[in-house]
UniProtKB/Swiss-Prot annotation:
Localization terms from the record: Cell inner membrane
Protein name: Membrane protein insertase YidC
Extent of the signal sequence: none
The keyword ATP-binding belongs to this UniProt entry's keyword annotation: no
PANTHER family: CYTOCHROME C OXIDASE ASSEMBLY PROTEIN COX18, MITOCHONDRIAL, OXA1
Predominant localisation class: membrane
GO biological process: protein insertion into membrane; protein transport
Alphabetically ordered keywords of this record: Cell inner membrane, Cell membrane, Chaperone, Membrane, Protein transport, Transmembrane, Transmembrane helix, Transport
Organism per entry: Pseudomonas fluorescens (strain ATCC BAA-477 / NRRL B-23932 / Pf-5)
Subunit structure: Interacts with the Sec translocase complex via SecD. Specifically interacts with transmembrane segments of nascent integral membrane proteins during membrane integration.
């Protein structure tokens, strides 16, 4: 029994550690299959799938092959960004194309020790490229011009949501060939979603035809919001919604494969409504088209090495003298499950808890409700641990009773070892007969470990993925439960509790097994050195409760045994 238990503990420890190291390899999620989609397979009313790129606008989807654009001189990129601020967003819009080139989150500091510096989500500088693009393409779309994208004008260079104001509307204007365009940004107090609308006023004598596109463009730079200590980087890449799969990932490697094989068309999906998103640690950006709209999703890598996930909406025609409007929602902010679920079905799945999501979701739900009462995530973890321990108490009690009986028959086991010596077969047979006679389950001590491991791994992913845990303080030196203990005090305490718990267990009869078991607290302490402090806190509290339970049950059984003997 002891060697089996030792092997089980070591195996689970190794498996747990490896799973943590491999988190960023997308557990349980199938990669988006590459599809060779010809232009004839596009959904009804959609422009043809992009089949190439131009030197001027490599990052913009191409219009249909018969598109022509009026000749005009190339224009230089604009350097004067339009600043827009609300209580939760601080963004900068490039007048050329109206792209959101910079976006900061004032309520989420870059670092805990510098709360005045907000986390920057979008950036289109020399060191990093990450921005949200949208425009109008098609036969008459201004963003389809080979000469360059339109340069919008604005009444001011800076806009800010005033006190007492719940909504901020910013209009960018552009006119060409008798058609007036307004690109409108609508932002609301307390919300991270931005409505991007196009108002088209056709004052020309010809029908206007085009379609809206929206995309997220990012380079291959690392995730600034993620910690890579011991390889615990979360998923950095694209994702989308389809009717058959509400959460489908498209990794950078997927786009690389298509880019390397020129015979393959870009990765495309025809969807109705849905969303496209770019994921990183704690934060997500997503374009959400109108519900019921037929769209073509495109994922690709451009010639500059940037990765793009976006969609093209249905083609629309505006008659001479008529007006039209099309829009989409851009979300750029924290992975708040409740908010994301309200925006679009399946978007909340970007909070990726891995293949144990069915355990992680209830754990997070419990944590949230406990936190609403105690107001501290550290204490929430402690009370959650107590609750879990209470739920599994019957199982733990049975296990501890089994171990107490094992301790009671330890002299008999020693006598069997002395009797049979090196004859392992007879020794094992005699041990099993003894266990049967004493009504001992030789695997009973393993059950709590087996039960705890899924909960342990699920809680790890909850702490890793939930933005609510980001920079969440506990007490004393623990100022952030989502990162490692800066002084490694909690892991050392955890190792000490494991050692104490080990003393309550029966000593393995084999000397080699005993040595291995003595090493387990040291091994686990090393594993936990770089784990999130919240996870180590859970394990420390769990061990302390286990020690109390085991001591109580063992003493109770020993007292009953002495009473029966008397």
């Amino acid at each position: 029994m002891d060697i089996k238990r030792t092997i089980l503990i070591v195996a689970l420890a190794i498996v747990s550690y490896v799973m943590v190291l491999k988190w960023n390899q997308d557990y349980g999620q199938a990669a988006l299959p590459t599809q060779n989609v010809a232009s004839s397979t596009t959904a009804p009313g959609l422009p043809d799938a992009p089949t190439g790129t131009s030197a001027a606008n490599d990052d913009i989807p191409r219009a249909a092959s018969d598109t022509t654009a009026p000749a005009e001189a190339p224009v230089a990129a604009s350097k004067d960004l339009i600043q827009i601020k609300t209580d939760v967003l601080d963004l900068a819009v490039d007048p050329q194309g109206g792209d959101i080139a910079q976006l900061r989150l004032p309520l989420y500091p870059r670092r805990q020790d510098h709360p005045e510096i907000p986390f920057q989500l979008f950036d289109n500088g020399n060191e990093r490229t990450y921005l949200a693009q949208s425009g109008l393409i098609g036969s008459n779309g201004p963003d389809a011009s080979p000469a360059g994208r339109p340069i919008y004008s604005a009444e001011k260079k800076s806009y800010q949501l005033a006190d007492g104001q719940d909504q901020l509307v910013v209009d960018l204007k552009f006119s060409k060939d008798g058609v007036n365009y307004i690109k409108r940004f609508t932002l609301k107090r307390g919300l991270y979603d931005i409505t991007v609308s196009y108002l088209i006023d056709n004052e020309s004598a010809q029908p206007w035809t085009g379609a809206m596109f929206a995309q997220l463009k990012r380079d291959a730079s690392s995730d600034p919001s993620s910690s890579t200590a011991t390889g615990t980087a979360t998923y950095l890449g694209a994702a989308l919604w389809t009717s058959s799969e509400p959460y489908k990932k498209v990794s950078m490697k997927d786009m690389d494969k298509v880019n390397e094989d020129k015979s393959k068309a870009p990765i495309t999906e025809n969807v109705q409504g849905g969303w496209v998103a770019w994921l990183q640690h704690y934060f997500v950006t997503a374009w959400i088209p109108p519900k019921g709209e037929n769209n073509q999703v495109l994922a690709r890598k451009d010639s500059k090495g940037n990765y793009i996930i976006g969609y093209t909406g249905p083609s629309m025609t505006v008659a001479p003298g008529a007006k039209a409007e099309t829009s989409a929602i851009l979300y750029a902010g924290p992975k708040s499950q409740a908010v994301l679920k309200e925006l679009s079905p399946g978007l909340e799945l970007t909070v990726d808890y891995g293949f144990l999501w069915f355990i992680a979701q209830p754990i997070f739900w419990l944590l949230q409700h406990i936190h609403s009462l105690v107001g501290n995530w550290g204490w929430s973890i402690i009370f959650l641990t107590m609750l879990i321990k209470g739920i599994f108490f019957p199982l733990s009690a049975a296990s501890y009773k089994s171990m107490a009986r094992m301790r009671a028959v330890a002299p008999k086991l020693a006598a069997l070892k002395e009797k049979f010596g090196d004859d392992r077969q007879k020794m094992s047979q005699a041990m099993m007969e003894l266990y049967k006679k004493e009504k001992i389950n030789p695997l009973g001590g393993c059950l709590p470990i087996l039960v705890q491991m899924p909960v342990f791994l699920s809680l790890y992913w909850v702490l890793l993925e939930s933005v609510e845990m980001r920079q969440a303080p506990f007490m004393l030196w623990i100022t952030d439960l989502s990162i490692k203990d800066p002084f490694f005090i909690l892991p050392i305490i955890m190792g000490a509790t494991m050692f104490i718990q080990q003393q309550l267990n029966p000593t393995p009869p084999d000397p080699m097994q005993a040595k291995v078991m003595k090493m387990m607290p040291i091994i686990f302490t090393f594993f936990f050195l770089w784990f999130p402090a919240g996870l180590v806190l859970y394990w420390v509290v769990n061990n302390c409760l286990s020690i109390a339970q085991q001591w109580y049950i063992t003493r109770k059984i020993e007292a009953a045994t002495k009473k029966a003997a008397a």
